[in-house]
């Protein structure tokens, strides 16, 4: 083997990572493309400068990482730059690692935004003028969904378990009128994600009907309890696997163009 030969490494930062399909997706892709690239899971029980230094400095061939829960917002203080999309979302799911003479610099991106936008494009196209979306959750995934909806001119309201704000209501505030005005409902919470498959958002499913569309950003399991209950009420229900694939390929474009 050529002494200059090296395998470029990527990975996923988060905790826990038992639910993730990313490693399997990228491994299969690299095998099919016959490229010298690999992808690993980096399950970090905490995130600080020391854990990042150990990760990045410990592998000189590590060129980029995806970031998942609970670190999409916690990673921000450690970044040298943010893409405009990531800055708008105040959340990052993709890191590009720049090697420098004195160490490294981390650059943050948000490919969830494009992944979500494309995965729900036909749903947003079916909204009547003035209709909007309810985004369940207020974390990094919810912020990415909000930016994507803003770019498509779709009004939206966050739904929280604990606090109200100018753009946020409680689950107990949801009424038939609110659903009629916001027939697209997005689950951007981890409720229902493997292994906690018996959990769900505290949503009033009885208010849904066949005019409603729900999108769950979770992809494991393929049919969450949220989706099952929404479908039983008559709503169209879709999971997040297509979004996962799109954001993964968008991340790979960023890393390969490094």
Language-model features, listed with the residues they occupy:
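Conserved hydrophobic helix-helix packing surfaces used for dimerization/oligomerization
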Residues: 10, 132-133, 214
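Rossmann-like adenosine-cofactor binding region
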Residues: 166-238
């Amino acid at each position: 083997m050529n002494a200059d030969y090296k395998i470029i490494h990527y990975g996923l930062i988060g905790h826990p990572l038992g639910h993730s399909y990313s490693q399997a997706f990228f491994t299969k892709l690299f095998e099919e493309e016959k490229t010298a690239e690999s992808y690993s899971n980096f399950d970090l029980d905490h995130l600080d400068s020391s854990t990042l230094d150990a990760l990045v400095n410990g592998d000189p061939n590590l060129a980029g990482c995806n970031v998942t829960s609970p670190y999409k917002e916690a990673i921000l203080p450690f970044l040298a730059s943010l893409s405009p999309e990531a800055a708008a979302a105040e959340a990052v799911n993709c890191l590009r690692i720049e090697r420098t003479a004195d160490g490294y610099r981390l650059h943050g991106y948000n490919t969830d935004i494009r992944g979500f936008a494309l995965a729900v494009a036909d749903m947003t196209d079916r909204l009547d003028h003035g209709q909007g979306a309810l985004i369940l959750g207020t974390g990094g995934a919810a912020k990415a969904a909000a930016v994507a909806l803003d770019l498509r001119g779709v009004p939206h309201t966050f739904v929280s378990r604990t606090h109200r704000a100018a753009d946020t209501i409680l689950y107990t505030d949801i009424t038939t009128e609110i659903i009629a005005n916001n027939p697209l409902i997005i689950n951007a919470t981890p409720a229902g994600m493997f292994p906690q498959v018996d959990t769900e958002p505290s949503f009033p499913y009885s208010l849904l009907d066949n005019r409603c569309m729900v999108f769950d950003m979770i992809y494991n399991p393929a049919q969450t309890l949220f989706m099952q209950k929404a479908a039983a009420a008559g709503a169209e229900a879709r999971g997040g696997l297509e979004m996962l694939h799109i954001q993964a390929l968008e991340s790979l474009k960023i890393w390969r163009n490094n």
